[in-house]
Amino acid sequence: LVIDKRSHKGGNLYCEDVDGIHVHKYGAHIFHTDNKDVWDYVNALVPFNGFINSPLARFQDKLYNLPFNMNTFHQLWGVATPAEAREKIKEQCAAYSHIVTPSNLEEQALKLCGKDVYERLIKGYTEKQWGRSAKELPAFIIRRVPLRFVYDNNYFNDRYQGIPEGGYNELID
């Protein structure tokens, strides 16, 4: 028995057909797994495309790769190696070492990734998302910031990724 709160099947995966386009009513959902058996199973039900999510963030008319990775760090500081990026982050975080227990999201982010990443790539997005200042948000919201020291813009680390070619409704049916 599956009980869905919404008036349609599929919950947040529900897709609406708008002029032949599958629109994810509640935001994009990208299926991802490292388990080949799971991937083979869902692909036996419906075909998936090979969509890879490689988002960009814009700050002051410059584009930055997400999640935070070596491409991002090169864009921010011109560094080329993981050691250089780690050193730059360590230097920036040192300015906030006096913060033992962060009392808000801003302090937590500054302690985890430093001023540049926070101000250019976290602060504005977070405040827009929550409709409040990062200083008013609890620290637990951003317990960790994934910092990847590889040149890979793939949002997920999983080997198998995609979206059902016919939309999620076909998979759910």
What name fits each language-model region?
Residues 1-18:
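Glycine-rich FAD pyrophosphate-binding loop
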Residues 3-5, 33-34, 166:
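Short His-Asn-centered micro-motif
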Residues 8-9, 25, 165:
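Short glycine/serine/threonine-biased micro-segments
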Residues 14-15, 31, 135, 171:
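Short, electropositive, low-hydrophobicity segments enriched in small/polar residues
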Residues 19-96:
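Dinucleotide-binding Rossmann-like beta1-alpha1 core, especially the glycine-rich loop
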Residues 62, 71-173:
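Active-site/ligand-binding neighborhood in enzyme catalytic cores
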